[in-house]
């Protein structure tokens, strides 16, 4: 019988948590945002091919977990499963389909094994300056918070889409 034992399941679970925790730690080490580097205002997760969250890193902000749990499903629906390729990177700060507010940016990458979609990795990080008046009492509308980035491809099959880059650099 080839059914994994409880010990094997626990080893696999610990490995998955280790991988997603390393994802979060890499983000902390390389972040430009002081909110990420010093306050840990981020979240990292691993997802199955349907966009269901399998695990979330221990490092980060628990407040991101609800938005992160639903986000990848929105990415799959907006991008279209038939348009998901190796080398892609997706991005958004859509407060309704990914982040909670414009100052949180979510990045999702599909993961492939032998040319077949195996799952997704996603992370959300707080960006202090996204333009606008800022979130909170000063902003009367979400559109006053700053730049709104709809769910889109930032990288298509390994090639950076310069449109968003040019808009941000403005």
PLM-predicted stretches and their roles:
Residues 25, 30-33, 52, 69-110:
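Conserved mixed alpha/beta core segments that line enzyme active sites in large multi-domain catalysts
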Residues 63-67, 98, 158:
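Hydrophobic core positions in small helical hairpin nucleic-acid-binding modules
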């Amino acid at each position: 019988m080839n059914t994994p034992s409880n010990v094997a399941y626990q080893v696999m679970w610990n490995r998955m948590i280790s991988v997603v925790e390393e994802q979060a730690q890499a983000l902390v080490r390389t972040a430009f945002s002081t909110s990420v580097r010093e306050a840990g205002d981020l979240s990292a997760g691993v997802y199955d091919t349907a966009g269901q969250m399998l695990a979330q890193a221990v490092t980060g902000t628990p407040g991101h977990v609800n938005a992160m749990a639903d986000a990848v499903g929105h990415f799959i629906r907006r991008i279209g499963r038939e348009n998901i390729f190796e080398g892609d990177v997706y991005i958004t700060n859509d407060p309704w389909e990914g982040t909670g507010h414009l100052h949180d940016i979510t990045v999702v990458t599909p993961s492939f094994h032998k040319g077949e979609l195996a799952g997704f990795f996603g992370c959300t990080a707080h960006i202090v300056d996204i333009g606008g008046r800022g979130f909170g009492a000063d902003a009367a509308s979400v559109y006053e918070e700053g730049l709104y980035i709809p769910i889109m491809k930032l990288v298509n099959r390994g090639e950076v889409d310069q449109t968003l880059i040019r808009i941000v650099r403005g």
